[in-house]
Amino acid sequence: MNNNGSLKRTIAVSLTNYLDAGAIVAGASGLTLWQKYLGLSEVHLGWLNFISANCLGAALGAIIGGVLADKYGRKFIYTYNLIVYMVGVLLILCSVNFPMLLAGFLITGISVGIGVPASWTYISESSEINKRGRNICISQMSWGFGPMIILLLGMFFAPGGYLFSWVETLAHAIGGAELAGDALNVFSSRVVFLSLLIVAFIAWNLQRKLDESDEWKATREAAKAKGEDTGLLHAFGVLFSNKTAVKTVCFLASIYRTWNLVASVMGFFQPHIYETAGGVSNEQANMLSCVGWAIVVAITFGLSFFIDKLPHKLFYVLGLIAALATWLVIISGVNGMGGLWAFSILWGINGGLSVQIFYALWGSELFPAKFRAGAQGLMFFIVRGLSAIWGLVFTYIYGENGEGFTLAAYCMIALLLISLIVGVIGAPNTRGKSLEEITKERYGDS
């Protein structure tokens, strides 16, 4: 397979990750503006978070996407899924009441989930043996670019921001010269979502031209030639009746679930950390977050040069050591800008060597093509579904004013230790092997 071709396909597919992460950050950063504009209560905000791209919406979408990608092909997802995404974003853009906003968040979240298993699976299946890890890293860089760019746009377009005058001009052109107050301010969030709509349209035009995965086609044709059932129930029946597949699901879900539970609640800790550091304005806090995401992108880019040459376990351990060091810094006290920078840099290193990279890589390597996307969709459903529940439980541990901060921090360390230990014990040796070789080693000729 042509090296440049695989890179081009990876970049086209990686735009999905930009849109996924961008939707999460755009939704979270604009909630206060929507709350004031629509007069939403904390219950309303809780529902928006619960069904969003960060929780239940993505969980449901992952199950749907995994099934569709295995049954109808990876190209099927890339032909239609971003149309669903654009409909969801357009609903948010045009929202004038809570039901519209809720529907937009849900549809966008489902689309985000649908794209995940197909994305990681397609990248691995279309990559050369010695470029599979590199291409997954390039894909993951988009998860860093998304939040970084959306945060910057949010800062520039926010009320009082450098480009808010441009937002005012646009808002008055659409809503009339009398538009003011919260109705005017919420246009800054609409503009951020507009940027996602534009990128989604570009990505859709690129992705719908992608070729189908050769491995999926070969597996499908072989199954038909043997007269095998290619239906959904049969695929999941095979998955759960195979001990190797079940053990793999448990292993991957364990390492990713424990790490993701920590990553998903970082938003609760950051305000507390900024307050502890003292004298940090909201703008400075956002800039620190942008720097953190820039570190994630830089570290992941560096990893892409070595992940196919050195043991995966080495980078997996280094990433979790950085994560544990981050929380030790937090527990010992973030005093002043020095501590704040240590926190941002360490968490950025963890993000650049994140468990998600290895989950995406191993998840696409350790299952046969006939239920590869479905298995990833199932695991993503489990992880994001538990994250939604954990987000509710965590608020009680943390407390309204952060009184449970220390206990919550120790919970984070315990979860990271579990991810580290399970990963070290179960990390597979797949480097330098084709997907066909890995499948034959693990599942035989069946």
Where in this protein do the model-derived segments appear?
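Cytosolic juxtamembrane N-terminal segment immediately preceding the first transmembrane helix
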Residues: 1-25, 36
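Extracytoplasmic gate region of multi-pass secondary transporters
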Residues: 28, 243-300, 391
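Extracellular/periplasmic helix-loop-helix junction of adjacent transmembrane segments
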Residues: 28-60
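Helix-to-loop junctions at the C-terminal end of transmembrane segments
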Residues: 62-73, 299-311
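Helix-breaking motifs and short loop linkers at transmembrane-helix boundaries and internal kinks
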Residues: 73, 94-99, 333-335
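Cytoplasmic helix-loop-helix junction between adjacent transmembrane helices
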Residues: 104-141
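Glycine-rich segments within core transmembrane alpha-helices of 12-TM secondary carriers
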Residues: 133-163, 167, 199, 380-391
